[in-house]
Design a protein with these regions (language model features):
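A residue-level marker of the well-folded mature domains of exported/periplasmic proteins
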Residues: 22-310
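Bacterial N-terminal signal peptides that target proteins for export
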Residues: 1-8
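Bacterial N-terminal signal peptides
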Residues: 8-18
Length: 310
């Protein structure tokens, strides 16, 4: 037997075997916090497009948990029953979803958290939300010259929100003459929630100089409430950089800044990371952080917006 000739043949066979064994992304399950929010719609659409680039025949199922824990548990169970290869999850409760995530992983499914971290996932892709909160609230501090009455309008207690509030508080803490009137009211992550909570603030507090809303929909709702009650002189900032906030920064509103995210790029990165893990390529870091940028009335003209068709 000619071993010199045999070894290259065996090596080639092994290489071809590895290529054949590469796993194709055939089915993707996406569970978002709320598809009533354009941000999450863009996340789902970005993930779908990237999955179809990897495999035009991929089956994508995108669902809204509506911030309902039991609903998201059922969605993960359905994904497992459907034998998806990859789940992208925007966890309603990062800790409580751990058992469902473990069940999916035990079934051989790769689970990647998007926008918020979640216990037990293979990897996470999200904005640096602490930095986003800092940027938005440092803007408030600067505009108010370090003094005044400020409100932090909170939201659903997922890590993206708690991290933004953490970053905001860090910026405000450096300005001792800033008084935080409230930081515990939940605007539900929605325009309606922001409007309702802001109406309460405006009734309770005769003087509000600034407000940080944890996302753009809440900021827009808050601005509307101030308009309805004819209250001016309030600087409103938020996080997202959504199309609606672009319009708000160009028109007659009290919204002055938003720390922008890129849900389209986030989703596409998450699919890439998940597909790599599916094929035994671990990411360099367990958590991929995307850097936010502050958009204001001064620089909105150069802002390219979310990198999608939205």
């Amino acid at each position: 037997m000619n071993l010199k000739r045999l070894f290259p043949v065996l090596a080639l066979a092994a290489l071809m075997s590895n290529v054949v064994q590469a796993r194709e992304l055939k089915a993707l399950g996406i569970s978002m916090g709320s598809l009533g929010n354009p941000y999450f719609v863009t996340l789902a659409d970005g993930a779908t497009e990237r999955a179809k680039e990897l495999n035009p025949n991929v089956k994508v199922t995108s669902v809204s948990a509506d911030y309902d824990l039991s609903k998201q548990f059922s969605q993960i169970d359905n994904f497992i029953s459907s034998k998806v290869d990859l789940i992208l999850i925007n966890a309603v409760d990062p800790s409580a979803m751990a058992s469902a995530i473990k069940k999916a992983r035990d079934a051989g499914i790769v689970v990647v958290a998007v926008d918020v971290d979640a216990k037990g996932v293979n990897a996470t892709v999200q904005t640096d939300n602490v930095e986003a909160g800092k940027l938005a609230c440092q803007f408030l501090v600067d505009k108010l010259a370090g003094k005044g009455n400020v409100i932090i309008q909170n939201g659903p207690q997922v890590t993206a929100v708690t991290d933004r509030v953490k970053g905001c508080k860090a910026a405000l803490a450096a300005a001792p003459a800033i008084k935080v009137l409230s930081d515990d009211q939940d605007g539900k992550g929605s325009r309606e929630g922001g409007l309702n909570v802001m109406q309460g603030y405006l009734t309770r507090f005769p003087k509000i100089d600034g407000l940080f809303a944890i996302n753009d929909p809440q900021a827009i709702g808050s601005d509307l409430a101030a308009k309805q009650l004819k209250r001016g002189g309030i600087i409103i900032t938020s996080v997202d950089g959504a199309p609606d906030i672009e319009n708000a920064l160009k028109t007659d509103t009290q919204i002055q800044a938003s720390a922008s995210q890129d849900p389209w790029a986030m989703a596409q990165t998450a699919v890439n990371v998940g597909n790599d893990i599916l094929n035994d390529k671990a990411p360099a870091e367990a958590v991929t952080l995307l850097t936010p940028k502050l958009i204001t009335r001064d620089n909105i003209g150069t802002y390219s917006g979310w990198s999608s068709k939205h």
